[in-house]
Amino acid sequence: MSRILDNELMGDEELVERTLRPQYLQEYIGQDKVKDQLKIFIEAAKLRDEALDHTLLFGPPGLGKTTMAFVIANELGVNLKQTSGPVIEKSGDLVAILNDLEPGDVLFIDEIHRLPMAVEEVLYSAMEDFYIDIMIGSGETSRSVHLDLPPFTLIGATTRAGMLSNPLRARFGITGHMEYYEAGDLTEIVERTAEIFEMAITHEAAKELALRSRGTPRIANRLLKRVRDYAQIMGNGLIDDKITDQALSMLDVDQEGLDYVDQKILKTMIEVYGGGPVGLGTLSVNIAEERETVEDMYEPYLIQKGFVMRTRTGRVATRKAYEHLGYEYMKE
């Protein structure tokens, strides 16, 4: 069974997200710093009749990087071609995509950190000088062919910016750090989703959902759907704060947005390791999760909310973690 607070896409959520996707910056809720910067850069590029500089969007899953890429293309009034790092297996695949671009087009590569190195190297000249050199034939009959490309904008999205090579990272003129959403912005997103799908919800219920959604719109919309189900079966269809609390309690999502896995991590740190420090590998083995899963999916939110600290000697549970789980804090 999938974890309700997983910030990766589940089931039909890609279709749902396309339905909810804003078209322009003015409609995009949250990420104000990124939006304000992009608005200036986009207007300047349009004023000069140039392609927008290559743009890197990075941050945890579910924060709207793909949506932002589509919004940028709409603001520029150009087409967007979408692909992802794992799909482009060899340089010939990328050459075919690049050769199909029209002047000013946006090429969006999701999970760009997963591009094979041979493919990435083809991007260097394409991004910097809008050309590629490709080899045709093999052996003694092989020859290099120079192929000019129209000016285009590459938008790369990644959850692991640190995994990008320095040469690739240096070729992005614009970077946007997508951060966890404030509760007010998430409340607005929940109310917008409810309106689009004709769900009856009170403002207080929307606020409660926002507070428990880990700062992530994808999770907020997923929880909203599950609370709607609960309201229709256990209530009269209205999503109010009481129904919301009952539904989220049933789903093991507490007032801080922690689920059973988060609580298991904190309890293990406190009960088994005295609050830490404990190494990430050791902790992962103890809770039977992959190290990368703990590091990428669980730990960022626990750190952001102040339940866990990273130290040079390992992870440490904070006073807030002790108090939240009802333990007496005895640390010096």
Curated annotation (Swiss-Prot):
Pfam family, one: RuvB_N
InterPro entries for the chain: AAA+_ATPase, AAA_lid_4, DNA_helicase_Holl-junc_RuvB, P-loop_NTPase, RuvB-like_N, RuvB_C, WH-like_DNA-bd_sf, WH_DNA-bd_sf
Name of the molecule in the record: Holliday junction branch migration complex subunit RuvB
Gene3D superfamilies the UniProt entry points to: 1.10.8.60, P-loop containing nucleotide triphosphate hydrolases (3.40.50.300), Winged helix-like DNA-binding domain superfamily/Winged helix DNA-binding domain (1.10.10.10)
UniProt free text on domains: Has 3 domains, the large (RuvB-L) and small ATPase (RuvB-S) domains and the C-terminal head (RuvB-H) domain. The head domain binds DNA, while the ATPase domains jointly bind ATP, ADP or are empty depending on the state of the subunit in the translocation cycle. During a single DNA translocation step the structure of each domain remains the same, but their relative positions change.
Enzyme nomenclature, EC number: 3.6.4.-
Sequence similarity: Belongs to the RuvB family.
GO cellular component, one term: Holliday junction resolvase complex
Function: The RuvA-RuvB-RuvC complex processes Holliday junction (HJ) DNA during genetic recombination and DNA repair, while the RuvA-RuvB complex plays an important role in the rescue of blocked DNA replication forks via replication fork reversal (RFR). RuvA specifically binds to HJ cruciform DNA, conferring on it an open structure. The RuvB hexamer acts as an ATP-dependent pump, pulling dsDNA into and through the RuvAB complex. RuvB forms 2 homohexamers on either side of HJ DNA bound by 1 or 2 RuvA tetramers; 4 subunits per hexamer contact DNA at a time.
Annotated positions binding DNA: 291, 310, 312, 315
Gene Ontology terms describing biological process: DNA recombination; DNA repair
Residues binding Mg(2+), per UniProt: 66
Region (Small ATPAse domain (RuvB-S)): 182-252
An example Gene Ontology molecular-function term: ATP binding
Keyword tags: ATP-binding, Cytoplasm, DNA damage, DNA recombination, DNA repair, DNA-binding, Hydrolase, Nucleotide-binding
Originating organism: Streptococcus sanguinis (strain SK36)
The reaction(s) this protein catalyses: ATP + H2O = ADP + phosphate + H(+)
Primary localization class, coarse: cytoplasm
Region (Large ATPase domain (RuvB-L)): 1-181
Subcellular location: Cytoplasm
Region annotation (Head domain (RuvB-H)) ranges: 255-332
Subunit structure: Homohexamer. Forms an RuvA(8)-RuvB(12)-Holliday junction (HJ) complex. HJ DNA is sandwiched between 2 RuvA tetramers; dsDNA enters through RuvA and exits via RuvB. An RuvB hexamer assembles on each DNA strand where it exits the tetramer. Each RuvB hexamer is contacted by two RuvA subunits (via domain III) on 2 adjacent RuvB subunits; this complex drives branch migration. In the full resolvosome a probable DNA-RuvA(4)-RuvB(12)-RuvC(2) complex forms which resolves the HJ.
